[in-house]
């Protein structure tokens, strides 16, 4: 595959760039020379630098949206029927509120004594740039805080005490450390037009539809009207899968036909098996776990689905039906941990209560830790994914990155810029590098205190924190290049668990803390630069963007921490399914995988899992496979440049395709891929004009309608225990009850036949 930077060529079409100042247009003789076709079709090349941005409306509506979404998403994250409200909902709701404030608030200006500064509750009409910053607030609130899972497993799963101040510092510092890496790499990941961040185009399209007036041809409708129509349809429809008929979210015909066959149900189940013939009639099935396919370029969809297909329909069946690693003793599709008898692993039998580490005598007298073969292979593929990312970026993009690095030090003229970069440099001051460094230093100091203070409750030593930061710094650029061009992010969660598991085994809290500092600081850095790219497209002053992101991060982290602490300390037996009342929603499904990972990597450790002492040393071969896999495709693309399909093979995407498993199931992948191919292959090529006007608007409207109806369903019906008469369609399943049953002889599992 060639470099992502050579994949698209600039258009030969010349367009005039406009800067609007005080209602008058200054026309610049520039062309829309962005090299990415989707960007040229979506992002305007106009700017009005006089528009107010950090207004009273921005702060009021932005902080309100941030707090509300942080609370709602954190609250629902503990419930069995999870709901995630995206920032699109706030983006829609705050538009009329902003316009209402513009009409009703006083316009009087207030001056600051001794300065030329002044401010007003109402500086003029509500504008698009205010709306963008409000959405950045909301997006930060909606994103959640990964570190709250540590608090949950410590207090609810392990039933241990955790100092409230240590927990608070943990949530804040893991979110803020990424600012440092963002500052270091923004030159490469934001300023370069080849780093186009596909998901941002959904937001750009929606902002334009909500704010811009259009010159329509006869018979055309505005993009805003199109959004409203799709939003209303999505909103009205979601009451069916969300409340009246949940079973249509995952339909598996094979299970309806063979109701008593375990093998048939494994083959047909879209939630617990291979999902042959399964599909969903629910937008949350399409986009809930893998994101909107409308925002992903087709070459990424093809690679992603190809990786999924190879894994689920070739590799996994071979391992399972040859009974490799005693695969048939355990369920086909699960993240649970097991002992040698095929039953759930009893972690309390091997933990020292006082020191909260492994009791080796108890472990040796009990059982080695077993995984489903699917879960074991997912770990192997995650090993290969990171190595493939390093190899791929070095082969295809190493020369470009090295040139950018040298240019950042010596060049004064931006050889790699485009019209958007020129407009930003002409109109706005960039963020000083010391702002990023200051946040990094302060965050690191507090993180060090959280780890070394409080009687070392987090178990992570100072050297572990430094190593976690070094890993995040090393991987931010290569993973950022992949995400900025494919809309897919490779996670560092497994590699960080592996490293600290070898270096500091038997310490579950040290393991999850190291993972969070290493993985989330990188992920947050890419989140920051992705938002900076949105601001780049929408011509938001970079310093205003920085301030909003920083404040929103602190506020969202505080709200998520407070919500988590409140629920854990007030809901009796939260997360403990065996002790909760029948029908209680507080089952914490999202934290179960996190808890199981802490057992695998923290308590047991990779030395007892992935070496000769354990069951799965073969997974280590994926490191070498991932490192070498991009080489033949790189060589072939160089040797046969006329073979265009070779240039589209993206090995890191293929390896990471199943990274959303086991939370994402086969039915989610199939539904996601089908919709993506229809819109970003067929419609993009056959009806490009329609696609340019409506594709990203359609994505935003489907998201918003589904999310808002989901909130209403909860508060109107589920929260008040209002339910429909019992019938089979109310089950939130695919009616494949035998798909979780093992096929091995003699394994007794409740509800399953014994072979």
From Swiss-Prot:
GO biological process: protein transport
Tissue: Highly expressed in flowers, and moderately expressed in leaves and stems.
Pfam families: OPT
UniProt entry keywords in alphabetical sequence: Membrane, Peptide transport, Protein transport, Transmembrane, Transmembrane helix, Transport
Subcellular locations according to the entry: Membrane
Listed GO MF terms: oligopeptide transmembrane transporter activity
Its membrane topology: Multi-pass membrane protein
Chain segments annotated as transmembrane: 58-78, 82-102, 134-154, 165-185, 226-246, 298-318, 370-390, 434-454, 462-482, 546-566, 614-634, 664-684, 697-717
Main location: membrane
Cellular component per GO, a single term: membrane
Superkingdom classification of source: Eukaryota
Annotated function: Involved in the translocation of tetra- and pentapeptides across the cellular membrane in an energy-dependent manner.
Entry similarity comment: Belongs to the oligopeptide OPT transporter (TC 2.A.67.1) family.
Protein name in UniProt: Oligopeptide transporter 1
Organism: Arabidopsis thaliana
């Amino acid at each position: 595959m060639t470099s992502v930077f050579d994949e698209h060529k600039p258009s030969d079409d010349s367009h005039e760039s406009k800067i609007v100042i005080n209602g008058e247009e200054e026309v610049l003789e520039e062309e829309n020379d962005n090299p990415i076709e989707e960007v040229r079709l979506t992002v305007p090349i106009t700017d009005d630098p006089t528009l107010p941005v950090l207004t009273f409306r921005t702060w009021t509506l932005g902080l309100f949206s941030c707090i509300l979404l942080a609370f709602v998403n954190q609250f629902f994250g503990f419930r069995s029927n999870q709901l995630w409200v995206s920032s699109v909902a706030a983006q829609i709701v705050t538009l009329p509120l902003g316009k209402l404030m513009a009409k009703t608030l006083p316009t009087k200006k207030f001056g600051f004594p001794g300065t030329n500064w002044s401010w007003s509750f109402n500086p003029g009409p509500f504008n698009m740039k205010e709306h963008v910053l409000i959405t950045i607030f909301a997006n930060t609130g909606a994103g959640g805080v990964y570190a709250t899972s540590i608090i949950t497993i410590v207090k609810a799963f392990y039933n241990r005490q955790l100092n409230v101040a240590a927990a608070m510092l943990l949530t804040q510092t893991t979110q803020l450390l990424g600012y440092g890496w963002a500052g270091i790499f923004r030159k490469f990941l934001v300023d370069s037009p080849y780093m186009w961040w596909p998901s941002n185009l959904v937001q750009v399209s929606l902002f334009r539809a909500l704010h811009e007036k259009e010159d329509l041809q006869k018979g055309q409708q505005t993009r805003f009207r199109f959004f409203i129509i799709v939003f209303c349809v999505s909103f009205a429809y979601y009451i069916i899968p969300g409340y009246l008929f949940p079973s249509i979210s995952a339909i598996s015909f094979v299970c309806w036909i063979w109701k008593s066959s375990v093998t048939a149900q494994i083959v047909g189940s879209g939630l617990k098996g291979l999902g042959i013939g399964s599909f969903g009639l629910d937008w949350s099935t399409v986009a809930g776990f893998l994101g909107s396919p409308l925002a992903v370029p087709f070459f990424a969809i093809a690679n992603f689905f190809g990786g999924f297909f190879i894994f689920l329909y070739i590799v996994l069946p071979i391992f399972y039906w040859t009974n490799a690693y005693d695969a048939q003793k355990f369920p086909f599709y699960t993240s649970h941990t097991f002992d040698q008898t095929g039953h759930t692993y009893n972690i309390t039998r091997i933990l020292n209560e006082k020191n909260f580490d492994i009791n080796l005598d108890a472990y040796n007298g009990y059982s080695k830790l077993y995984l489903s073969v699917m879960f074991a292979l997912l770990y192997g593929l995650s090993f290969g994914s990171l190595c493939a990312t390093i190899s791929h970026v070095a082969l295809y993009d190493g020369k470009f990155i090295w040139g950018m690095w040298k240019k950042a030090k010596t060049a004064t003229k931006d050889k790699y810029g485009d019209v958007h970069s020129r407009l930003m440099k002409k109109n706005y001051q960039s963020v000083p590098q010391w702002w990023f460094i200051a946040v990094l230093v302060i965050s690191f100091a507090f993180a060090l205190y959280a780890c070394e203070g409080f009687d070392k409750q987090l178990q992570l030593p100072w050297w572990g924190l430094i190593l976690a930061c070094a890993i995040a710094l090393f991987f931010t650029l290569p993973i950022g290049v992949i995400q900025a061009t494919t809309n897919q992010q490779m996670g560092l969660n497994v590699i960080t668990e592996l490293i600290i598991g070898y270096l500091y085994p038997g310490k579950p809290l040290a393991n999850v803390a190291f993972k969070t500092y290493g993985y989330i600081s990188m992920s947050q850095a890419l989140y920051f630069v992705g938002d900076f790219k949105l601001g780049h497209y929408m011509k938001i002053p970079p310093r205003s963007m920085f301030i909003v992101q920083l404040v929103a991060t602190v506020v969202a982290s505080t709200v998520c921490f407070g919500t988590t602490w409140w629920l854990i300390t007030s809901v009796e037996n939260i997360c403990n399914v065996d002790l909760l009342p029948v029908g209680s929603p507080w089952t914490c499904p999202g934290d179960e995988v996190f808890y199981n990972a802490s057992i695998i990597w923290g308590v047991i450790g990779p030395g007892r899992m992935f070496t000769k002492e354990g069951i799965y040393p073969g997974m280590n071969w994926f490191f070498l496979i991932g490192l070498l896999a991009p080489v033949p495709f790189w060589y072939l693309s160089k040797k046969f440049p006329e073979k265009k399909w070779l240039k589209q093979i993206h090995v890191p995407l293929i390896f990471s395709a199943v990274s959303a498993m086991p939370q994402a199931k086969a039915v989610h992948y199939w539904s996601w891929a089908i919709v993506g191919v229809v819109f970003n292959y067929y419609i993009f090529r056959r009806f490009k004009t329609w696609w340019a006007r409506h594709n990203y608007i359609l994505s935003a409207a489907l998201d918003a309608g589904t999310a808002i109806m989901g909130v209403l369903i909860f508060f109107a019906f589920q929260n008040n225990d209002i339910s429909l008469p019992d019938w089979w369609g109310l089950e939130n399943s695919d009616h494949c009850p035998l798909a979780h049953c093992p096929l091995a002889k003699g394994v007794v599992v409740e509800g399953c036949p014994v072979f």
